[in-house]
Amino acid sequence: MTPLRERYLSVITGHLFPEHGGATLDSHRAFVVSYGPEADCDLDLHYDNSEVTVNISLDDQFSGGELYIGRMFTDSQSVSQSSPSEYCACQHRLGCGLIHRGQQMHGALPLLSGVRHNLVIWMRSSVTRNQLCPMCQMKPDLVKVGGTGDGFSASDVDICCLV
């Protein structure tokens, strides 16, 4: 996934969302969501823990389950005051994806028949996240850890120096 993000998706998102971390995406979380009789059949309105999200349809043997997308979470009007007419329904097509800002409110309408799988990639920018956490809307208090995290990074701080 890292080469896909670095070589291709970052180029696209850099053009689409330059002011929202699109060109500085440096980490990701990828997972598959499943909808069907033995799983969830819909998904309530929400926003993602990402600067940019890619949602790719992995099959086409289903009906219903459209993705609906609308206003930004950070818009001044409360999401609870939103009306259904403010949202746009997007059909899933095998192998096709939708790229949107993580803060864009969205959900999935009920699946009517079949089983649907989607690859979801949450892409994150430490440049953006180090200034403001997209989930709590506060400046993060970072602690350095090994490995990769959720798009945050902490720089080393000298706590003493020789004079």
Where are these regions (language model features)?
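Fe(II)/2-oxoglutarate oxygenase catalytic core
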Residues: 1-94, 103-163
